[in-house]
C-alpha cells in the first residue's frame, strides 16, 4: 500500500478491479457529533451491507476526517493542548480529498489515509476503498468547497441540537483521553465558532435535511429506499446541471411527514424551525 506519511495517499487500482459503472456519490454533512457517521452506519445496516465482505459491498462509507493535513511539530504541539483548529477548512487536505473522490467517482479502487485522533497524526497505514454502487462521504465541511460539493449526486445535512452535539463530543473526547477543561475550551474557542462560520452556512446546499439524526427514522427509511432503488436499477442516476435541472429539497421534522419520494424542487416549510440555536 502507499504510505500515508505526509504524501498523497490515493492510488488507482489495476484496470481489472474497476467496475463498469460510476457510483452514486452521497455527501453527508452536519456539525461535530451531530450523528453523521451514525446515520451512515444505520443506512448500511438497513441495507444489509455492514456484514458484507469489503470487496463485495455495494455501499461504502468514507469520512472526511481521514483527510486532515499532516501537522508540523509546532501544530501537533498545539493540537495536543487543544489549541489547534481542526474545524477550519484549511485543516483538511482538500486537493487530496478531491483527487480521491474523483477516482472513486470514476470507479477506481483507492487507498485513503488513516488518521490517529489521539496522537493527531497521519499513520503509515492506508485503508483500501473498493468500488461500490453507492458511496457515502461524511464530514463537517464536505459541502464547503464548491469543487467537492458539486461532485455529490445527493446531499444530506444532519441537523442536531447544539447541546446534544456538545454532550456527545465531550463523551467522545473523554474516551480519547482528553481533559474535560481542554475539551470545553477547544469547543468554545474553535468548534462552535467554526460551525457557525463554515458548516452551518452550507446547510442551504443540502437536498435533504435530517433533524435529530439517526432518531429520525422517517428520513432514514426514505433515504434507504432511495438507495435501494438505485441499487436495484429502478432510478436513473441524475447529475446536477443536467437538462432536467432536478434537485431535491426536503426536511423531515414531524411524525407523519413522509412523502413517497423526495420532493422535487422545494423545501418543506418545517426547515426554518430546525436550525440549531
Swiss-Prot record:
Q: Catalyses which reaction?
A: uridine + ATP = UMP + ADP + H(+); cytidine + ATP = CMP + ADP + H(+)
Highest taxon in the source lineage: Eukaryota
Q: Which family does it belong to?
A: Belongs to the uridine kinase family.
Give the EC number(s) under which this enzyme is classified.
2.7.1.48
- Quick one: where's region Disordered? 1-30, 247-277
Q: Which residue positions does Phosphoserine occur at?
A: 253
Q: Name the SUPFAM superfamilies for this protein.
A: P-loop containing nucleoside triphosphate hydrolases (SSF52540)
Give the active-site positions: 65
Q: Write out the entry's keywords from A to Z.
A: ATP-binding, Kinase, Nucleotide-binding, Phosphoprotein, Transferase
**Can you list the GO cellular component terms from the UniProt entry?**
cytoplasm; cytosol
GO MF: ATP binding; cytidine kinase activity; uridine kinase activity
The name on file for this protein is Uridine-cytidine kinase 1
* Record's function text: Phosphorylates uridine and cytidine to uridine monophosphate and cytidine monophosphate. Does not phosphorylate deoxyribonucleosides or purine ribonucleosides. Can use ATP or GTP as a phosphate donor. Can also phosphorylate cytidine and uridine nucleoside analogs such as 6-azauridine, 5-fluorouridine, 4-thiouridine, 5-bromouridine, N(4)-acetylcytidine, N(4)-benzoylcytidine, 5-fluorocytidine, 2-thiocytidine, 5-methylcytidine, and N(4)-anisoylcytidine.
Q: Does the keyword Transferase apply?
A: yes
Q: Any stretches that span the bilayer, and where are they?
A: none
Q: Where is the composition biased (Basic and acidic residues)?
A: 268-277
Q: Where does substrate bind?
A: 87, 115, 120, 169, 178, 186
- Which Pfam families does its entry note? PRK (PF00485)
According to UniProt, the tissues expressing it are described as:
Ubiquitous.
- Name the positions where ATP binds: 30-38, 215
Cite the annotated pathway: Pyrimidine metabolism; CTP biosynthesis via salvage pathway; CTP from cytidine: step 1/3; Pyrimidine metabolism; UMP biosynthesis via salvage pathway; UMP from uridine: step 1/1
Give the record's GO biological process terms: CTP salvage; UMP salvage
Enzyme category, top tier:
transferase
Q: Which residues carry this modification: Phosphothreonine?
A: 251
Amino acid at each position: 500500500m502507499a504510505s500515508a506519511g505526509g504524501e498523497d495517499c490515493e492510488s488507482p487500482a489495476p484496470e481489472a478491479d474497476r467496475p463498469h459503472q460510476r457510483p452514486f456519490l452521497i455527501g453527508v454533512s452536519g456539525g461535530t457529533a451531530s450523528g453523521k457517521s451514525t446515520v451512515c452506519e444505520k443506512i448500511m445496516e438497513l441495507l444489509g451491507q455492514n456484514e458484507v465482505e469489503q470487496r463485495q459491498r455495494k455501499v461504502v462509507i468514507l469520512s472526511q476526517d481521514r483527510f486532515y493535513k499532516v501537522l508540523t511539530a509546532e501544530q501537533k504541539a498545539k493540537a495536543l493542548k487543544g489549541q489547534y483548529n481542526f474545524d477550519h477548512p484549511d485543516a483538511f487536505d482538500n486537493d487530496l480529498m478531491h483527487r480521491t473522490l474523483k477516482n472513486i467517482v470514476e470507479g477506481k479502487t483507492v487507498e485513503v489515509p488513516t488518521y490517529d485522533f489521539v496522537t493527531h497524526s497521519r499513520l503509515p497505514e492506508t485503508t483500501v476503498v473498493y468500488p461500490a454502487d453507492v458511496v457515502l462521504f461524511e464530514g463537517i465541511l464536505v459541502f464547503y468547497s464548491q469543487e467537492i460539493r458539486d461532485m455529490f449526486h445527493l446531499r444530506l445535512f444532519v441537523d442536531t441540537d447544539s447541546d446534544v452535539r456538545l454532550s456527545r463530543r465531550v463523551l467522545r473526547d473523554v474516551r480519547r483521553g482528553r481533559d474535560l477543561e481542554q475539551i470545553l475550551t477547544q469547543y468554545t474557542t474553535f468548534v462552535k465558532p467554526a460551525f457557525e462560520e463554515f458548516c452551518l452556512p452550507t446547510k442551504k446546499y443540502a437536498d435533504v435535511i435530517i433533524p435529530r439524526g439517526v432518531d429520525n427514522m422517517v428520513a432514514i427509511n426514505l433515504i434507504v429506499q432511495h438507495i435501494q432503488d438505485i441499487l436495484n436499477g429502478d432510478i436513473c442516476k441524475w447529475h446536477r446541471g443536467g437538462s432536467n435541472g432536478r434537485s431535491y429539497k426536503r426536511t423531515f421534522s414531524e411524525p407523519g411527514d413522509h412523502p413517497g419520494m423526495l420532493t422535487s424542487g422545494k423545501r418543506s416549510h418545517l426547515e426554518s424551525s430546525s436550525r440549531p440555536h
